Amino acid sequence: MKRFFLVAISFIAMVAISASAAPNPSTTKVPAFPGTLANARYVYVTSYDGGQFDPNLFFEDRSAINAVQNAIQNWGKLIIVYQPSQADIIIRVTSRPSEDLLAVYDAHEHSSFLWRVMGRDGLQSGETPLVTQFEKGFEGVQHNAR
């Protein structure tokens, strides 16, 4: 009985310690934003599964594209374009029930992403915390470039 009691207390202590050590999502650090994007002015927003007007695109992805475009237009630091050839950067989004994704690519190089952030409910209409993280990173790079 004493052994069971000791194991139970140890388990409770471990759970309490791990719960207190978990990062607070509201204070998580914004990933480093590449300095090569400091001069970007034009942005094209799309989904990994297709463009905004693709009839086969999931409704959630289409809504995420609209939410990101609206947030960027309200922010006013970048100009939305509707053709990838006119963009300096391309933002690709995916919205799923488990997690949303926002990634930034160089529009002129077809390579891996330059910056990426993920989170649950990060690209919902009216509230886009992933775009807020993008804005903070972008402003930080512009501030450092001066």
Language-model-detected regions and their locations in the chain:
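Bacterial N-terminal signal peptides
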Residues: 7-16
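Positively charged n-region of N-terminal signal peptides that target proteins for export
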Residues: 1-4
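A structural "domain/chain start" motif
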Residues: 20-74, 85, 114-119, 139-146
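A short, hydrophobic beta-strand-centered structural micro-motif
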Residues: 45-47, 73, 79-103
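A broad, structure-centric signal for solvent-exposed, well-ordered loop/edge residues
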Residues: 8, 52, 87-88, 111
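Short amphipathic alpha-helical "recognition" segments used for binding
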Residues: 6-7, 139
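Amphipathic beta-strand/beta-sheet edge segments enriched in Tyr/Trp
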Residues: 89-146
